[in-house]
Design a protein with these regions (language model features):
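Glycan-processing catalytic domains of CAZymes
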Residues: 1-266
Length: 266
């Protein structure tokens, strides 16, 4: 089974970027950086996401993946950022940046398409385009980079036809956007495992109820973490991804609950 903590990721975003989205209704002020988030939780794997407010910033000039203390062991970068993000003019993604960084930094293990399964995105990024992205990631360097997606329980609930696209990915990161749906996590995990050929899933763990724009209840937070631990131990998921550095320092009880949960994982 190995060390379960080695399977835990943090989703890291530019400080304050979520507070710029008024609909999230986040309290407080966020100053924590992604690397500080890793250090606070004492975990080693970072998934760096680009939001709309990061448009125009290249990863080569990104201060939030600079790791002077050696806190990070694995890194994933968004090939396509959040739903409001757009690539630089003349580009369709951040592939060139990712490959350039990966040549120098062996910690970079994957590229991820965030907020992917919207009709508008699937129309632009067809299965053929995704297959091309995957082939580049797998073969352009002296080692393969994995190709990950972000999927939500809402796509399962609506019955959206996403399978032709989803099967082009190596792994699905699965997220429960509305906290009330935590009560049906088994159903959504089964669906998430059906999306790729090998059924590989990293389970996303929200520390804020973004769907309802409010703090997640302590009961739902604990239930979500208990379920995640159970599936880590059973091997039904490859890992968990905590969301995110953007809500860890704004006074939410979920942060402390998660830290205590992590402290009991070996």
């Amino acid at each position: 089974m190995g060390n379960l903590r080695d399977k835990i990721w943090l989703l890291g975003e530019t400080p304050g970027s979520h507070h710029k989205v008024k609909g999230y209704n986040l309290p407080g002020e966020n100053k924590m950086t992604p690397i500080e988030g890793l250090e606070y939780f004492d975990i080693k794997n970072l998934c760096r996401m680009k939001m709309r407010s990061d448009m125009g910033m290249t990863y080569m000039e990104d201060p939030y993946i600079v790791d002077e203390k050696g806190s990070m062991e694995k890194l994933s970068l968004t090939l396509i950022g959040s739903c409001a993000w757009r690539p630089a003019k003349g580009k369709r993604d951040d592939m060139d940046e990712i490959l350039e960084i990966a040549k120098k930094d062996k910690r970079l293990v994957s590229a991820i398409n965030d907020d992917f399964f919207y009709p508008e995105r699937m129309e632009i990024y067809t299965p053929e385009v995704l297959a091309e992205q995957r082939e580049i990631l797998h073969t352009a360097l002296d080692r393969p980079l994995e190709f990950w997606s972000v999927a939500y329980e809402r796509e399962c609930k609506t019955g959206a036809d996403i399978y032709a696209h989803a099967k082009e990915y190596d792994l699905t990161t699965l997220w429960i956007w509305y906290s009330e749906n935590i009560d049906e996590m088994n159903k959504y995990l089964e669906w998430g495992r059906s999306l790729t050929k090998d059924g590989r899933v990293i389970l996303g763990v929200y520390m804020y109820d973004y769907g309802n724009a409010r703090p997640i209840s302590d009961d739902h937070m604990k239930k979500q973490l208990d379920f995640t631990y159970e599936k880590l131990v059973s091997g039904e998921i490859e890992g968990a991804m905590l969301h995110s550095s953007c809500n860890m320092d704004i006074g939410l009880s979920a942060t402390q609950i998660t830290k205590e949960w992590l402290d009991n994982i070996k």
